[in-house]
Amino acid sequence: MDSQQLVWRGNTLLDAATAAADAQGCGGDSGVGDVGADGVGEAGAGDSGAQLAHVLSDVIYIGDEESLLIERLTRTVRFRCRGTTSGGEVFTFTQPGFTVSTLVGDCAGRSYELRRISPWRKGRVIMRGDVEVGVVEAGARELVVSLARLDSGDELPLIDVVFLTWCCVLVDMPQREMRG
């Protein structure tokens, strides 16, 4: 699968070029990824090594224009998270079963299923219908996201990628240190 690589490092989503440069001590562009006319952009934007999103006090900031308020719903044993955009769109991420092996995301009407690759690893495949659109792999300090290269018009909206993968950080890397 030809793919684009992204990395959640701490509270920041970086493209692979920035993540690799930071790992080598080379710095990297601290700018924000390319943004479309609606202020959100597509998941393929930001190939120059940019910060695509960051989280501060339960708000995800995507580019300069979009923000997503995140609420973890803790009334039940199952994991549930809801996000609301500044424009009022609602995003949900739920654990429908007893375990977190399968998670379901709804991003303003766009449905996704995130399934564990193996019972012994924290990797997940992201499905939209019956099409694999990405893979998420949780490491000790970062969450690596590989997005499939899809036909033009079929790309995942960047806001969907950010919300779904941040929820994977919350589920699969709960001992993270929050900064900011």
Whereabouts are the PLM-identified features?
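Intrinsically disordered, low-complexity proline/glycine-rich segments
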Residues: 1-180
